[in-house]
């Protein structure tokens, strides 16, 4: 039920953030999905409140459908990916964030809509659909959209772009 998944998700987020902040400051970027739009906002609000006095954690929980993050020469766009056509994402990035686009040389978009790994490159910009750690809900099961539960953590160099990732299979 939604209450169990809500509680489980924010507790998983707190556990993960607490671990990561022992290594480096943590920036949390909350992206709503097409099936959990309101719940993801609530989770983001809980996380923001939980860490309100913690200088090692920042939370971006605004309602923008696409969010951008700069790390050195890297430009990252985060979106659920159900509204945009993948091949249009590079132009969307350049249009919405022209200064960041011009100042960076490594650019990627991370999307989650398909709940499975899928990577395409358009004009030198990778559009990456990432797998989900969440179990399939009844709607996904009814539709036959089964996918392996997998989490991925990306390793970025400020100067050289993405250098690899770690994968965790649930």
Language-model region placement:
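Conserved beta-sheet core of the metallophosphoesterase superfamily
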Residues: 47-63, 71-170
